[in-house]
Amino acid sequence: MEFGLSWIFLAAILKGVQCEVQLVESGGGLVKPGGSLRLSCAASGFTFSNAWMSWVRQAPGKGLEWVGRIKSKTDGGTTDYAAPVKGRFTISRDDSKNTLYLQMNSLKTEDTAVYYCTT
């Protein structure tokens, strides 16, 4: 009986500390080479304004590739980019909307991928 109660107690503790982080991307589509796209990532379940946020991507049949990141405003809000996208992609954030953006210009066929935001 004690064993069963211990498990119930443990489950109650775990349930109490659950935190559901949600990152929902939108804005993808089909564009011709040279075109532009803007992706959005709506965040919830954590303090977005304090978080450093990144974009990664996965091309068909390939592994994950880091695209870039933006620091929190308190840490300067600066951005860094992977060499293949530098000068073409821009990451920004709107802390009032808990939203991260990826503006992609001068798109190339090699930019074809599934894009994910991460923290």
Swiss-Prot record:
Top-level taxon of the source organism: Eukaryota
Stretches the record annotates as Complementarity-determining-3: 118-119
Annotated ranges, domain Ig-like: 20-119
Disulfide bonds: 41-117
A Pfam family recorded for this sequence: V-set
Complementarity-determining-1: annotated segments: 45-52
Protein localization: Secreted; Cell membrane
Coiled-coil ranges (or none): none
GO biological process, one term: immunoglobulin mediated immune response
Region (Framework-2): 53-69
One GO location term (cellular component): extracellular region
GO MF entries: antigen binding
Function of the molecule: V region of the variable domain of immunoglobulin heavy chains that participates in the antigen recognition. Immunoglobulins, also known as antibodies, are membrane-bound or secreted glycoproteins produced by B lymphocytes. In the recognition phase of humoral immunity, the membrane-bound immunoglobulins serve as receptors which, upon binding of a specific antigen, trigger the clonal expansion and differentiation of B lymphocytes into immunoglobulins-secreting plasma cells.
Name assigned to this protein: Immunoglobulin heavy variable 3-15
Native source species: Homo sapiens
Gene: IGHV3-15
